[in-house]
Amino acid sequence: MQQAQVLSKDSAVDDLFARFGAAAFVPQPSADNTPTLWVSRERLLDVLSHLKRRFPMLLDLFGMDERLREHRPAAARDFTVVYHLLNIAGREEIRIKVALSDADPAVPSAAQIWPNANWYEREAWDMYGINFSG
């Protein structure tokens, strides 16, 4: 099985940096070489909507409780919501992460972009109390 693209001349990361500016993201290395970027909650829907053209599949969406994690990424806060996107035809994937505080564990819903997000968002709400608005 061929591994997904990481960074190429026309990478999704380069595309995002060109569209939103590199300062809008915090890159995170990953063990599986999947490009992983942290983005603010305020920019999330714009970024996900832009990525939808290139990544038609929301492979996974999940919440993480980071409060007791000892070796967490610098960008993490109390909770993290992770969006794992896939482009089967282009054999590439990307992860987008959003850090949330315990005082305000809310993020806009991605269900209008990928309808299957609704199911994943319900699970994150049930497990961690993360609210998905919209």
Cite the ranges covered by each PLM segment.
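Terminal low-complexity/charged segments
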Residues: M1-G134
